[in-house]
């Protein structure tokens, strides 16, 4: 039996970070510092809409669930991260641990899928924090990270309100009933962690919204492409080696200076064959455009 209450997770700090992240906005392009060619950006907008917006929509689609989910076989980028949850590993102390819903009753074997072990630990720790008695005093409960996180979710459910738990006159029975609801809610919310990990045919990456994309180099999920200019090239023409760690920004190519590094071993070597997790292949969209059209798209991306 694993005692999930014995953990070093700082829930209050984690929830504070989540609340800060929730109000972050993408940074605007520093026009005063680097300038912006508005005419070129205007030429880039229709090119972006024709060649990029199918995956990188500016707003989420309410009509097509999972519209930003791009299959690995379609985008052609390194599949290792997408398939990582299916990796088998020594389960160690988790061997024999019960699985939460929807796999309730099943136990973790040895070896086990890395995704199953991670999900089991996350769910067990959250449940232990949220529902293990005794319920703390109202003032302390209101400030707890788990309560603050759940409070927002419960507010969107008809007839549900966690604030009742803050009533010092609430009976022990009523508190227990509320905690049972919380446990069921967490189980339901986290059950999708236990979906079977995908084979290559079902693996996918999120094709993110590109607001503030200028500030997020290097590119692709593994940072294997140094700047936007390189990303719009065919794989065969991309740099396979560049320096990382520089804080000198390159406003022309939109990335960081890749010819210098503050680190002794600051050279990144990409794998065009996408075999070792550092692949820079794939995402060959817009690679048939002219250089002038690529520069126009890049100028438009600065405006997002």
What spans do the regions from the language model cover?
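Periplasmic c-type cytochrome electron-transfer domains
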Residues: 1-304
